[in-house]
Amino acid sequence: MTEEVNPKAFPLADAQLTAKIMNLLQQALNYNQLRKGANEATKTLNRGLADIVVLAGDAEPIEILLHLPLLCEDKNVPYVFVRSKQALGRACGVSRPIVACSVTTNEGSQLKSQITSIQQEIERLLV
């Protein structure tokens, strides 16, 4: 029943980066800096609020979220794919699978250093 990661899902986070991202998502949820779902992620990007966009590589069909990488590149926001939509949903504090989410900007947030370090790691994946 496990769905394979689509080859269009690039850049794909490795296990270590995925763990850091999931940890950040759980903390962002506590600080009210997490928007869940492809539509919410699109809204935060359009409003210029998104810091990082996380996408599920096993979304079916993958085309439902392939507009997000284009929008991220347009707005200069780092994005990354993780392997499992189920794990993404759990990290976001929801019992259902989630195909996309975004961590939003907040001035004076304690998460700023963590967000910056993950942004740099995502940018290293693209090189």
UniProtKB/Swiss-Prot annotation:
Q: Which GO terms describe its molecular function?
A: RNA binding
User: Which InterPro entries does this UniProt record tie to the protein?
Assistant: eL8/uL1-like, H/ACA_rnp_Nhp2-like, Ribosomal_eL30-like_sf, Ribosomal_eL8-like_CS, Ribosomal_eL8/eL30/eS12/Gad45, Ribosomal_eL8/Nhp2
List the GO biological process terms.
Answer: maturation of SSU-rRNA; mRNA splicing, via spliceosome; muscle tissue morphogenesis; positive regulation of translation; post-transcriptional regulation of gene expression
Identify one Pfam family in the record.
Answer: Ribosomal_L7Ae
Where in the cell?
Nucleus, Nucleolus
Query: Could you tell me the keywords of this UniProt record?
Result: mRNA processing, mRNA splicing, Nucleus, Ribonucleoprotein, RNA-binding, Spliceosome
GO cellular component terms, alphabetically, are: box C/D methylation guide snoRNP complex; nucleolus; precatalytic spliceosome; small nuclear ribonucleoprotein complex; small-subunit processome; U4/U6 x U5 tri-snRNP complex
On the tree of life, the source organism's domain of life is Eukaryota
Q: Which family does it belong to?
A: Belongs to the eukaryotic ribosomal protein eL8 family.
Described purpose of this protein according to its UniProt entry: Binds to the 5'-stem-loop of U4 snRNA and may play a role in the late stage of spliceosome assembly. The protein undergoes a conformational change upon RNA-binding.
What's this protein's name?
A: NHP2-like protein 1 homolog
Q: What is the lineage of its organism?
A: Eukaryota, Metazoa, Ecdysozoa, Arthropoda, Hexapoda
